From Swiss-Prot:
Provenance organism: Wolinella succinogenes (strain ATCC 29543 / DSM 1740 / CCUG 13145 / JCM 31913 / LMG 7466 / NCTC 11488 / FDC 602W)
Residues annotated as transmembrane: 19-39, 50-70, 90-110, 133-153, 166-186, 225-245, 261-281, 292-312, 320-340, 368-388, 411-431
Disulfide bridges in this chain: none
Name of the molecule in the record: C4-dicarboxylate transporter DcuA
CC terms in the record's Gene Ontology section: plasma membrane
Family recorded in the similarity comment: Belongs to the DcuA/DcuB transporter (TC 2.A.13.1) family.
Any Pfam family hit: DcuA_DcuB
Topological relation to the membrane, as annotated: Multi-pass membrane protein
Protein encoded by which gene: dcuA
Function, in words: Responsible for the transport of C4-dicarboxylates.
Taxonomic lineage of the native organism: Bacteria, Pseudomonadati, Campylobacterota, Epsilonproteobacteria, Campylobacterales
């Protein structure tokens, strides 16, 4: 029966992947019907906290986008990339990493990918190199963002173990960023000469490759103000979450918990942007970040609920099987999280499904934090939206998905970045805890 239940979970996930987009969440609901109504499993916990945090953060980001703030950030990113075009392989992941770090969602990378592709092409660099690292960096940065649902959940799970919110960020930010930079350095050592790519030459001969110059940017009246308001909102979240942590204790017995506070601050941020940037609030519903964020909520609802249902119904079996393995080989947790996130399609959903089980197995905080970056393996299956966008935006053909599905340019940078980040985590975490 256990094997059949696993097959049901995998079948639901693969059906969702095949249908694409929001259907990953839909298929999770189908899997729940089979597991609960068909096989008699008790429904697991719905990740309401994760979903509401994503909704709140996306509401603020979408308001900033409508105000022109996101375009302003992309303009700054383009200026940076064009100021040092020869270093595009290093600057591309820097841009997407920090945009995700600030926004709490990797969907902000959509806006920068066309710029990265253009600058790389103009420099004769295979766009696949900076694009692949940039996409991976935008996924890994989720595990270091102060306002991402994954980090907020992880912080809450670790607090009873004596690890504060600020400690978690102090470990995750440098280890993941350095991991991405080392990966960029390694990838830059390989052949990045676009002119020697046979597919590129073929596409040039057919007139399928176009060079575009720098786009003209005109800032909306409230663009800079919306960015400032959003940054102040993030700082407020970090300050409050730090102040209520047991390690700092500036606020004793807080009335509002961390999750609720983030929702309050982000919705307030959206309100202030709407008031002072004078945006059309109806336009928020059509913003690309709002649509992708709400899609993410449905996906998290479906796959995280499905995953938690399976795990919670077999937690004792999992403890018995995995306890001894993790005790002797703690790094195996990172591998488990890697493959789980590949299927669950969400950092927050993966953390929500497996971190409580790892804590129940008495996995130590160092291992938990060091392995956290491994929940970012969303690049393995070439169906994630930012990955597909990178493929579509590269008209040179260098960023392409092979016939065997897994042979695409995101695999090597992704595995390297996660592996290095996890290794650095095992070095840095014992020092800071």
């Amino acid at each position: 029966m256990l094997v059949f239940e696993i097959l049901v979970v995998l079948a639901a996930i693969f059906l969702g992947v095949r249908l694409g987009g929001i259907a990953i969440g839909y298929a999770g609901g189908l899997g729940m019907i089979v597991l609960c109504l068909g096989l008699g499993l008790k429904p697991g916990s719905i990740p309401i906290d994760v979903i509401l945090i994503i909704m709140s953060v996306i509401a603020a980001i979408a308001a900033m986008q409508v105000a022109g703030g996101l375009d302003y950030l992309v303009h700054l990113a383009e200026k940076l990339l064009r100021s040092q075009p020869k270093h595009i392989t290093f600057l591309a992941p820097v841009v997407t990493y920090f945009m995700t770090l600030l926004a709490g969602t990797g969907h902000t990378a959509f806006s920068t990918l066309p710029v990265i592709a253009k600058v790389a092409k103009e420099q004769g660099v295979k766009p696949s190199v900076p694009l692949s690292i940039a996409v991976v960096a935008s996924q890994i940065a989720i595990t270091a963002s102060p306002v991402s649902a994954a980090v907020v959940f992880m912080s809450g799970a670790l607090e009873p173990l004596g690890v504060g919110y600020l400690q978690l960020l102090a470990i995750c930010i440098p280890t993941t960023f350095i991991g991405c930079m080392i990966t960029a350095f390694i990838c830059n050592l390989f052949n990045t000469d676009l002119s020697k790519d046979p597919v590129y030459q073929e596409r040039v001969a057919k007139g399928m490759v176009k060079l575009r110059g720098q786009t003209q940017y005109v800032a909306k009246p409230g663009a800079k103000l919306s960015v400032l308001i959003f940054l102040v909102g993030i700082l407020a979240v970090v300050f409050y979450a730090t102040a209520i942590s047991k390690n700092v204790g500036l606020i004793q017995n807080p009335i509002v918990g961390r999750d609720s506070a983030i929702m309050m601050f982000m919705l307030t941020t959206a309100t202030l942007i709407a008031m002072f940037a004078k945006i059309d609030t109806d336009a928020v519903l059509n913003a690309s970040t709002f649509k992708s964020g709400m899609t993410a909520c449905i996906c998290v609802l479906g796959v995280a609920w499905l995953g938690d249902t399976f795990v919670s119904n077999h937690i004792n079996d999992i403890k018995g099987f995995a306890g001894g393995i993790l005790e002797g080989h703690p790094w195996m947790l990172a591998i488990t999280l890697f493959f789980a996130s590949m299927l669950l399609y969400s950092q927050a959903a993966t953390a929500k499904a497996l971190i409580p089980a790892a804590i129940a197995l008495s996995v130590d905080p160092v291992t938990l934090i060091a392995s956290f970056a491994a929940v970012s393996a969303l690049f393995v299956l070439p169906t994630y939206p930012t990955l597909l966008a990178a493929v579509q935006m590269d008209d040179t053909g260098s960023t392409r998905i092979g016939k065997f599905v897994f042979n695409h340019p995101f695999i090597v940078p992704g595995v390297l970045a996660i592996g290095i980040s996890v290794a650095l985590g095992f070095i840095v975490a014992p020092i800071l805890l």
